[in-house]
């Protein structure tokens, strides 16, 4: 079956990553050829298996274009396209709270470009916040090997300012001040719920 992205490019299943032999003391848990998405998926699997949280990646909707019917009782999809995702990457429940978040990365070393986000994602997070959900973004500076968890409210400040003539990126220095830096470990690979604990506790104390 041929699956295509919205731009028509053919989707190809990524092959297995080759393991590299190294001493445990020199392992950088963020440098194993994994995508940020896979690292978060692995972390979510750990949280689920240990009854800590239930968080899943939302499936990307697919539009079926061509179907063959070699048998009356079976249909074979020959061609399909990934549709544009309408919301964010992940959602779930933790400590009785609804979570909704996006994961993005950049090769830029000094700022995070706001063009990595889409208007429909910002709108969706605003709607979730209005219903007392907890929304945030996990940002990775790939060239620096650094990870941050930034609340949606802080993201909105920069998103709204760009429409008023403000800069179209968030400086790394601002992210260092506003966001919680996440550090790789063995399990979970990205312990982002540790940072969320502080956000939930602060929110609970206000109410």
From Swiss-Prot:
The keyword Transmembrane does not apply. InterPro entries: Resolv_RecU (IPR004612), Restrct_endonuc-II-like (IPR011335), tRNA_endonuc-like_dom_sf (IPR011856). It is found in: Cytoplasm. The keyword rRNA processing does not apply. GO terms for molecular function: endonuclease activity; magnesium ion binding; nucleic acid binding. Binds 1 Mg(2+) ion per subunit. Residues 1-21 are annotated as: Disordered. CDD domains: RecU-like. Keywords: Cytoplasm, DNA damage, DNA recombination, DNA repair, Endonuclease, Hydrolase, Magnesium, Metal-binding, Nuclease. It comes from the Bacteria. Its cofactor is Mg(2+). Its EC number is 3.1.21.10. Mg(2+) binds at residues 87, 89, 102, 121. It holds the Pfam family RecU. One of its GO terms (cellular component) is cytoplasm. It catalyses: Endonucleolytic cleavage at a junction such as a reciprocal single-stranded crossover between two homologous DNA duplexes (Holliday junction). The record marks 104 as: Transition state stabilizer. GO terms for biological process: chromosome segregation; DNA recombination; DNA repair. Belongs to the RecU family. Endonuclease that resolves Holliday junction intermediates in genetic recombination. Cleaves mobile four-strand junctions by introducing symmetrical nicks in paired strands. Promotes annealing of linear ssDNA with homologous dsDNA. Required for DNA repair, homologous recombination and chromosome segregation. This is Holliday junction resolvase RecU. It comes from Lactiplantibacillus plantarum (strain ATCC BAA-793 / NCIMB 8826 / WCFS1). The gene is recU.
């Amino acid at each position: 079956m041929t699956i295509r992205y919205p731009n028509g490019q053919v989707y190809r299943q990524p092959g297995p990553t080759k393991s590299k032999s190294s001493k445990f003391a020199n392992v950088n848990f963020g440098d194993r050829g994994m995508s940020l998405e896979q690292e978060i998926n692995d972390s979510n699997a750990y949280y689920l298996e240990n009854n800590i949280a239930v968080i899943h990646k939302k499936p990307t909707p697919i539009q079926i274009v061509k179907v063959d019917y070699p048998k009356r009782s079976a249909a074979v999809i020959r061609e399909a396209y990934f549709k544009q995702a309408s919301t964010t990457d992940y959602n779930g429940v933790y400590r009785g709270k609804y979570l909704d978040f996006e994961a993005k990365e950049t090769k830029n070393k000094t700022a995070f470009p706001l063009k990595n986000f889409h208007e429909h994602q910002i709108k969706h997070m605003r709607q979730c916040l209005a219903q007392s959900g907890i929304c945030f973004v996990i940002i990775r500076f790939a060239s620096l090997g650094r990870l941050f968890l930034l609340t949606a409210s802080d993201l909105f400040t920069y998103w709204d300012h760009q429409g008023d003539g403000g800069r179209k990126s968030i400086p790394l220095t601002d992210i260092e001040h506003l966001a919680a830096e996440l550090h790789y470990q063995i399990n979970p690979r990205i312990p982002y719920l540790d940072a969320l604990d502080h956000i939930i506790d602060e929110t609970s104390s206000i109410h």
